């Protein structure tokens, strides 16, 4: 009995030394609850990511495992090295960009697409190491950052509506409404409203509940075939290590690589700042602790993710749900990572999720990301026009890269045309010139 108590106290002492629980005003129990809460809000990614990457021709069972592995790796590393209550997983938006645009629309092998993700992650890692990342964040205007986030939201939302069958291709009008009486459409729409209603009532597992309910209804209608719940993890040999580094070093992919890097730069940085701010972890000068370590872990996770066969990795805003119930240290993130490792044994469940069950989650994420348009100064056209062009051109051109390019260029045009040259930072000018060169010398040929 005494030996057991000694073992427990030594274990708690180790956690105290690693995570400084008392200093942050928290306990092991609180951190465990926070980790479980964060996990419930983001576990949907293990069902949605395989669905999306499956469009690119990747083995969905293997992607399920690699999604769990990289989420576990990134979250545990964030907890141990940065001691922040922030979990990581493959980024929604960039996974859709990879599957629907880079592979499906551009006709590239998914291995080459993974290579583009790798080089984008390496670029992000170098920007972090040499502190250029902080300079770019500070010098790219809010309107462009918001336009990029919102444009990806519109792009994801469109993919969700397409996967649910709500919108379909039409040669005369480009798109038109689908068969709304089809049960797949009805279930996809139902799934979205389940998420929206539960989320508005602060139910943390809203997305997970929606996926479970719509999958069960699909099973009752004969769309889903029960294959079990628990099994040994599927093989990952079909995706792990199949990244084409040489094939992706192509001048024609420069814009794609830059897009992966730039979007991940803003996404992770914004999430890390937002979550740590909500946790009250800023110091007396308003600076956030261990941000360099956090950004480093984020970049390394994306590099690792491309090698094992999954899309760009980012910090998840869903981490704020764990913070809201008391998560203050990296122990929260470690708990999330451990739970993702346990989920690997539930691979049969992931294989049963139909496309329309995941569609509701895509539409919901689109709503969340598009809401950032409210931050644009709409009464200032030099800010509103670039934000609008960036956002709408992503879904309309079916390319996140083109949306970013036209947004940066239009920002320079508006500022130069109105004589507000002081608003143009060197960063914006350099990026805009690079995109102009891409359009003239690469896209034109």
Which residues fall in each region the model found?
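Membrane-embedded alpha-helical modules
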Residues: 106-216, 220, 334-445
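Helix-loop-helix hairpins and the membrane-proximal interhelical loops
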Residues: 2-62, 175-177, 208-292, 433-437
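Loop-to-helix transition at the N-terminal end of transmembrane alpha-helices
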Residues: 56-76
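Helix-coil boundary and interhelical linker segments in multi-pass alpha-helical membrane proteins
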Residues: 51-63, 101-112, 251-254, 354, ...
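Helix-loop-helix junctions within the multi-pass membrane cores of secondary transporters/permeases
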Residues: 11-45, 49, 70, 91-100, ...
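Juxtamembrane transmembrane-helix boundary signature
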Residues: 2, 71-92
């Amino acid at each position: 009995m005494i030996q057991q108590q000694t073992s427990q106290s030594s274990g708690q002492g180790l956690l105290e030394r690693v995570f400084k629980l008392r200093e942050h005003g928290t306990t092991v129990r609180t951190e465990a609850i926070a980790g479980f809460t964060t996990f419930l809000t983001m576990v949907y990614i293990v069902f949605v990511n395989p669905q999306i990457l499956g469009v690119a021709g990747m083995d969905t069972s293997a992607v399920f495992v690699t999604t769990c592995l990289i989420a576990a790796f990134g979250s545990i590393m964030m907890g141990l090295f940065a001691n922040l209550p922030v979990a990581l997983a493959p980024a929604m938006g960039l996974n859709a960009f990879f599957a629907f645009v880079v592979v499906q629309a551009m006709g590239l092998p998914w291995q080459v697409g993974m290579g583009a993700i790798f080089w984008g992650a390496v670029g992000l890692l170098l920007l972090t190491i040499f502190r250029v990342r902080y300079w770019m964040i500070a010098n790219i205007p809010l309107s462009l950052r918001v336009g990029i986030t919102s444009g990806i939201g519109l792009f994801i939302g469109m993919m969700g509506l397409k996967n649910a069958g709500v919108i379909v291709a039409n040669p005369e009008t480009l798109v038109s409404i689908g068969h709304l009486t089809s049960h797949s459409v009805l279930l996809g729409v139902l799934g979205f409203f389940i998420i929206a209603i539960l989320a508005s009532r602060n139910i943390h597992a809203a997305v997970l509940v929606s996926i479970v309910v719509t999958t069960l209804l699909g099973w009752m209608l004969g769309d889903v075939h029960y294959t079990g719940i628990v099994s040994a993890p599927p093989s990952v040999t079909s995706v792990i290590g199949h990244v084409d580094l040489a094939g992706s070093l192509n001048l024609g992919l420069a814009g794609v690589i830059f897009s992966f890097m730039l979007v991940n730069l803003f996404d992770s940085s914004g999430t890390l700042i937002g979550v740590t701010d909500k946790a009250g972890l800023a110091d007396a000068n308003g600076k956030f602790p261990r941000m360099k370590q956090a950004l480093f872990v984020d970049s390394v996770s994306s590099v690792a993710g491309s090698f094992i066969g999954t899309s760009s990795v980012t910090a998840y805003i869903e981490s704020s749900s764990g913070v809201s119930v008391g998560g203050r240290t990296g122990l929260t993130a470690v708990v999330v990572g451990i739970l993702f490792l346990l989920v690997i044994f539930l691979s049969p469940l992931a294989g049963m999720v139909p496309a329309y069950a995941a569609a509701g989650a895509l539409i919901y994420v689109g709503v969340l990301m598009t809401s950032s348009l409210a931050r644009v100064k709409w009464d200032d056209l030099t800010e509103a026009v670039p934000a609008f062009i960036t956002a709408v051109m992503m879904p309309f051109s079916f390319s996140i890269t083109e949306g970013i390019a036209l947004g940066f260029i239009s920002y320079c045009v508006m500022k130069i045309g109105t004589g507000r040259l002081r608003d143009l930072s060197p960063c914006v000018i350099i990026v805009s010139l690079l995109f102009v060169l891409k359009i003239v010398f690469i896209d034109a040929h």
